[in-house]
Amino acid sequence: MLFRSQIDFCDGYFFAVIQNSNTFQVSNLEDGTTWNGLFISTISYFPDNIVSMKVDHREVWFFSGKKSIAYYNSGAGYPPFIPIQGAFLEDGCGATFGTETVSDTIGWIEQNDRGQAMAKVMNGYKGQRVSTLAVEFAWQKYPTIADAVSYAYQDQGHDFWQITFPTANATWVYDFNTGLWHRKGFWNASLGTYSKHRTISHTFNFSKHLVGDPQSGSVYQMNIDTYTDFGNTIRGMKRSPTVMAENKWINFSEIEFLIETGLGPIPSFVDGNGQPRGPQVMLQWSNDGTKNWGNTYYLDCGHAGEYGKRVRKTQLGRARKRVWELSWTDPIPFRIIDAFLVATSDGKPIYQSGERLSEQYRKIA
């Protein structure tokens, strides 16, 4: 009996990868229940097993652990699929279910004779790297990347590619519109730690983003206007790069966060004493490269209607290098736009007044 590890569909035919082999089988035309034993093909372009298969733009891509090749419908023979001349990569795939159709192309986690753990997307018949050195450094420290699972979705005009590494307990997301990566996680409030995000599958149906959670066996709706995660608290977090001035002492006078304020609920949140309070963000900083963190400061983001509320902190001490961290857990839409820092070194401002923090970081990077 043949065991099939993956199935896909192209031009009226179903394709199935034969498990632990470099062969695949094609069904009868428009009949996924009939599989002719004569319609089994062996890929001679690479000797190792097929790791992953993906259909995109009426082409069937087969990825081994070190190389890849695409087939197309030639219109001749039965079944009519043959290799595409020139559609051969000296790169393979390191994760069977990490391959995904993303932003009108294919994305996969690369593996080859030289190494592994790069995120690539197909650009024509070439692989284009989209992961960064920092992302790859993190992935290459994982116990395995072979169990990675990914899905793609589009929301608020952005195309996202979400990749979860179950053994490493981590989830990463790439934004094709900005070219930036971010981490996504499930916040365990009792332990005070993040774990991988609980969703590993997605479909868009009934005008809804529906995601599968293997932990509960349930399907949930993913919605930007829902501020809980499976009924649990969502903890958002942003962390800055290191702020330095040639390792000299920096005196930090003020940091202000440009946040849409006045979005508190009615009735208001209440504090530990039962008194009304506005939504809050939590500010911390580290002066030793994130090895240790100081006190947590709660910054008020304004009750409902306090749209002019400023979110800032003064008297910030000094350091030779500092990393800022902002986090939040209140179930409202925190829209954090920018941050502004007032700081001096040797009596001179380290940044021009009013300069955007992103531009400040660019200058010191």
Tell where the protein language model's regions lie, with residue ranges:
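Beta-sheet repeat architectures centered on beta-propellers
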Residues: 85-365
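Beta-propeller and closely related beta-pinwheel folds
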Residues: 1-149, 185-190
